[in-house]
């Protein structure tokens, strides 16, 4: 493993034996890396991390390079635990046949310091749906909180047993010609996806690690158990009526308990509800303003407005009813228009 940008980190995993065309390393690597962002766009610059796979020869005295996979850690910033499957690229594609192997990597990133506001570069990965595939290559990502890189080891073969995401692992599998035809060909998933693989860079937010909601459901929690309702026959009519009344009262009490029983909402629905509660409803504000206004017709307001006055020679002027008193009596006469 080698960090090409944003720092200097090199590491080697332990040597493992190939079993059933698969290799499981189950190793975890942690290191710090520095990412810069464009001042104009805020998009993170590429931060390449290379994982190369080698095969020992001559009893460990020599080795052959099977291939490598370059991971742009900037694509995973802020995505929490992300799993990526990569097809190994060959070093010498002209003279050497490329190895048919898939590397599975789990990436977890944590923001240690710096500005938490940034944009991830567009993903260069591809998502290939497979019919009958039980494990989705494009699952909801998990949020995290910090910027440290953890590297682990996972299984990359279609036939081998699956490794849980918590056991971050690097894996590399070699498939035969028949197995390669039957293998689960998986491309790169998006930077927001979470497959099962090996290193992880997270800029964790509020989402809890491991919470993957698939829908909104309301689950009714168990309420307090109600007492069994029994009505024993009684020869006395008064006692029978009392028993029936008690039974009805218990039924009403049980229904009230069920009504008061709290309903546990899914995390997504509860988060949306909390966000809506903090927002001001514009319709309510407009309704309050309309209710506070008086739109009734006031006749007295019309009489106190401007009036038309006509003076000698046909001159006109506008003013209130105090205008004749100011300009002198007889100078202007009020014009009255009857409706």
From Swiss-Prot:
Domain annotation C2 NT-type: ranges: 1-111
Disordered: region residues: 226-262
Ranges in coiled-coil conformation: none
Bias kind Basic and acidic residues: ranges: 249-259
PROSITE patterns recorded: C2_NT
Tissues expressing the protein: Expressed in bone marrow-derived macrophages.
Residues with Phosphoserine modification: 197, 255, 267, 299-300, 329
Keywords for this protein: Phosphoprotein
Compositional bias (Low complexity): 230-248
Family listed: Belongs to the EEIG family.
The name this protein goes by in its record: EEIG family member 2
Gene symbol of the encoding locus: Eeig2
């Amino acid at each position: 493993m080698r960090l090409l940008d944003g720092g200097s980190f090199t590491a080697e995993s332990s040597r493992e034996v190939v079993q059933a065309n698969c290799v499981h390393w189950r190793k975890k690597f942690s290191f710090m890396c520095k990412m810069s962002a464009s001042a104009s766009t805020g998009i993170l610059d590429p931060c390449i991390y290379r994982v190369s796979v080698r095969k020992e020869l001559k009893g460990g005295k020599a080795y052959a390079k099977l291939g490598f996979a370059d991971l742009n850690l900037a694509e995973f910033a802020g995505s929490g635990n992300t799993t990526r499957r990569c097809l190994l690229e060959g070093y010498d594609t002209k003279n050497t046949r490329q190895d048919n192997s898939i590397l599975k990597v789990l990436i977890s990133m944590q923001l240690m310091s710096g500005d938490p506001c940034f944009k991830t570069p567009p993903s260069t990965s591809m998502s290939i749906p497979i019919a009958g595939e039980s494990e989705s290559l494009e699952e909801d990502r998990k949020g995290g909180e910090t910027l440290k890189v953890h590297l682990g080891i996972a299984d990359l073969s279609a036939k081998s047993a699956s490794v849980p995401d918590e056991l971050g692992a690097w894996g590399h599998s070699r498939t035969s010609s028949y197995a390669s035809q039957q293998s689960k060909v998986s491309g790169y998933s998006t930077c927001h996806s979470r497959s099962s693989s090996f290193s992880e860079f997270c800029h964790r937010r509020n989402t809890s690690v491991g919470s993957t909601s698939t829908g909104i459901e309301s689950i009714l929690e168990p309420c307090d158990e109600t007492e069994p309702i029994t009505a024993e026959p009684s020869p006395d009519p008064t006692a029978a009526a009392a028993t029936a009344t008690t039974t009805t009262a218990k039924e009403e009490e049980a229904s009230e308990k069920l009504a008061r029983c709290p309903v546990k909402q899914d995390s997504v629905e509860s988060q949306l509800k909390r966000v809506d509660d903090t927002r001001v409803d514009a319709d309510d504000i407009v309704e309050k303003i309309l209710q506070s206004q008086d739109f009734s017709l006031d006749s007295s307001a019309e009489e106190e407005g401007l009036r038309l006055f006509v003076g000698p020679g046909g001159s006109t002027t506008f003013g209130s009813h105090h205008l004749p008193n100011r300009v002198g009596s007889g100078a202007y006469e009020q014009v009255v228009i009857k409706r």
